[in-house]
UniProtKB/Swiss-Prot annotation:
The lineage of its organism: Bacteria, Bacillati, Bacillota, Bacilli, Bacillales. It comes from Staphylococcus aureus (strain Mu3 / ATCC 700698). This is tRNA (guanine-N(7)-)-methyltransferase. One of its GO terms (molecular function) is tRNA (guanine(46)-N7)-methyltransferase activity. It is an enzyme of class 2 (transferase). Belongs to the class I-like SAM-binding methyltransferase superfamily. TrmB family. The active site is at residue 117.
């Protein structure tokens, strides 16, 4: 996805430190950042925030973190949080490789990866969010009952992710090869999911856990 640069976005985000972490000021203190101590769920690569804000509105008993590195997109998530008055959703503007700088071991209950960049060239495999170095980070911060939810329209990335997770020692509790035909009605659409689905694209989804989180 090509992101149009917004020169004012960084200053706008910095004006809301109670909602947005720009420079790691809450690193290691995620639980304390929220008003209530509740399970923490993360979406990595939140885009414009439709998925994560909908989840937060539906589940006030869960604390959510939107992690998105593109400042020129994050402001849209911030606008939604403010408009909806969500107190259980915070935003980290940083790269996923920094996850263990923000979260303590076992602090997270669920991680969402929705329509991540597939990085189709083999030489870019290390950038895929289901590459083994990222899986190691997820394993570190997830608690013993924690799980990973993954959605994509990219068949190649889905196949790669199944193999990568299996080789890493994960197991699958749910796999959908055509989500919108199989879904039970609980699926929450992302902005891109609706766009892809309207074009007739098949949506793939899985839920996975680590055999041993630690």
């Amino acid at each position: 996805m090509r992101v149009r640069y917004k020169p004012w976005a960084e200053d706008y985000l910095k004006d809301h430190p109670e909602l947005v972490d720009m420079e790691g000021q809450h690193a290691g203190e995620m639980t304390e950042w929220f008003d209530k101590t509740q399970p923490i769920h993360i979406e990595i690569g939140s885009g414009m925030g439709q998925f994560i804000t909908t989840l937060a509105a539906q589940n006030p008993h869960i604390n959510y973190i939107s992690m998105e590195r593109e400042k020129s997109i994050v402001y849209k998530v911030l606008d939604k949080v403010k408009e909806m008055g969500l107190t259980n959703l915070k935003i980290i503007c940083n790269d996923a490789i920094e996850l263990n700088e923000y979260f303590k071991d076992g602090e997270v209950s669920r991680i969402y990866l929705n329509f991540s960049d597939p990085w189709p060239k083999n030489r870019h495999a290390k950038r895929r969010l289901t590459y083994h170095t990222f899986l190691a980070l997820y394993q570190q911060i997830l608690n013993d009952e924690g799980d990973l939810h993954f959605k994509t329209d990219n068949r190649g990335l889905f196949a790669y992710s199944l193999e990568s997770m299996s080789q890493f020692g994960m197991y699958f509790t749910k796999i959908n090869l055509n989500l919108h035909q199989e879904d039970d009605g609980s699926n929450i659409l992302t902005e891109y999911e609706k766009k892809f689905s309207d074009k007739g694209s098949r949506i793939y989804r899985m839920e996975a856990k680590f055999h041993s989180q630690k």
